[in-house]
């Protein structure tokens, strides 16, 4: 059950591992990744309006100053594409509370676009076929399809080939960003030559120990080049590894956000408070659990 029909959450996407497995003739890299979603999220709210005014976007929150409500914003592009598919005129205003850091390796913009598709489908009363929605999502970006229905996924291809996996065991997640944006194209350009085979994964993970066994045999191929471009990532990873109860620490996506796994969400919250209290810790930090459903989020999120 949705808490509010006019509200949608855009949770952070975390790549627990990321292997670069090849490269297409058009230059796009092929990936193999295990993606989950955290309770940390942006929040989208819809206010109805006149069709003559079209669809508008208002930005607020900590990350708003780094974005612009211009026509090429992914949220507006998603709305226009959905309206075109449904044969209607886009209308209303989306208020985007930007809480996640921008250009940080956790799919914030992609998740915002996917949340906009879910939200506008609901408030405009349209029911696009799943394949049509997936096609729109893919046209917006390789990371948008996985964000349509947040869960646990194996991502392949350029990110558009998705395999839904069984739910994760309960784990804690600490996310931290040093406050330095990292360019994804630059990270790929600075990657060493060669490719990594796809990871071997179990069919399910009954507990944290089973999950860690698989993750310890994998890696993030983009972490070394990102660390060369942004030394603050290495400093942050070292700090995360030293936190009490830390089980696995790694960078997500192309950075600069890093994560640490804990046995329980409460342990991750405690560690986040400790990290924030440490001298010199700037940027952004969050601790909690995995995203389950919109209604499962604490109402204080709103």
Curated annotation (Swiss-Prot):
Protein residues bound to ATP: 101-111
Catalytic activity line of the entry: 4-CDP-2-C-methyl-D-erythritol + ATP = 4-CDP-2-C-methyl-D-erythritol 2-phosphate + ADP + H(+)
EC number(s) given by UniProt: 2.7.1.148
Transmembrane segments: none
Xref: Pfam families: GHMP_kinases_C, GHMP_kinases_N
Molecular functions (GO terms): 4-(cytidine 5'-diphospho)-2-C-methyl-D-erythritol kinase activity; ATP binding
InterPro entries named in the record: GHMP_kinase_C_dom (IPR013750), GHMP_kinase_C_sf (IPR036554), GHMP_kinase_N_dom (IPR006204), IspE (IPR004424), Ribosomal_Su5_D2-typ_SF (IPR020568), Ribsml_uS5_D2-typ_fold_subgr (IPR014721)
Pathway: Isoprenoid biosynthesis; isopentenyl diphosphate biosynthesis via DXP pathway; isopentenyl diphosphate from 1-deoxy-D-xylulose 5-phosphate: step 3/6
Active site (record annotation): 13, 143
GO biological process, one term: isopentenyl diphosphate biosynthetic process, methylerythritol 4-phosphate pathway
Keyword annotations: ATP-binding, Isoprene biosynthesis, Kinase, Nucleotide-binding, Transferase
NCBIfam families membership: ispE, PRK14608.1
Entry similarity comment: Belongs to the GHMP kinase family. IspE subfamily.
Role summary: Catalyzes the phosphorylation of the position 2 hydroxy group of 4-diphosphocytidyl-2C-methyl-D-erythritol.
Protein name (Swiss-Prot/TrEMBL): 4-diphosphocytidyl-2-C-methyl-D-erythritol kinase
Protein's organism: Granulibacter bethesdensis (strain ATCC BAA-1260 / CGDNIH1)
Lineage of the organism: Bacteria, Pseudomonadati, Pseudomonadota, Alphaproteobacteria, Acetobacterales
Gene: ispE
């Amino acid at each position: 059950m949705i808490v509010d029909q006019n509200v949608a959450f855009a949770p952070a996407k975390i790549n627990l591992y990321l292997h670069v497995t090849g490269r297409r003739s058009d230059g796009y890299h092929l990936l193999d990744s295990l993606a989950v979603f955290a309770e940390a999220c942006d929040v989208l709210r819809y206010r109805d309006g006149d069709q003559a005014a079209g669809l508008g976007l208002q930005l607020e929150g900590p990350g708003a100053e780094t974005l612009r409500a211009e026509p090429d914003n992914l949220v507006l592009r998603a709305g226009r594409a959905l309206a075109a598919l449904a044969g209607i005129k886009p209308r209303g205003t989306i208020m985007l509370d930007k809480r996640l850091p921008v250009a940080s390796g956790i799919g914030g913009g992609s998740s915002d676009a996917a949340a906009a598709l879910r939200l506008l489908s609901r408030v405009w009363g349209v029911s696009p076929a799943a394949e049509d929605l997936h096609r729109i999502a893919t046209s917006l970006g390789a990371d948008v399809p996985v964000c349509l229905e947040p869960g646990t996924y194996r991502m392949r291809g350029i990110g558009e080939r998705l395999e839904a996996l069984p739910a994760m065991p309960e784990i804690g997640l600490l996310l931290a960003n040093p406050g330095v944006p990292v360019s994804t194209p630059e990270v790929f350009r600075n990657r060493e030559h060669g490719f990594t085979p796809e990871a071997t994964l179990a069919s399910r993970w009954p507990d944290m120990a089973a999950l860690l066994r698989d993750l310890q045999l994998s890696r993030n191929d983009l972490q070394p080049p990102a660390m060369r471009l942004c030394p603050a990532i290495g400093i942050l990873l070292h700090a995360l590894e030293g936190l009490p109860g830390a089980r696995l620490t790694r960078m997500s996506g192309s950075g600069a956000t890093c994560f640490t796994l804990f046995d329980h969400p409460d342990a991750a919250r405690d560690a986040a408070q400790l990290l924030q209290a440490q001298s010199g810790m700037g940027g952004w930090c969050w601790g909690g659990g995995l995203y389950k459903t919109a209604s499962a989020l604490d109402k204080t999120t709103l």
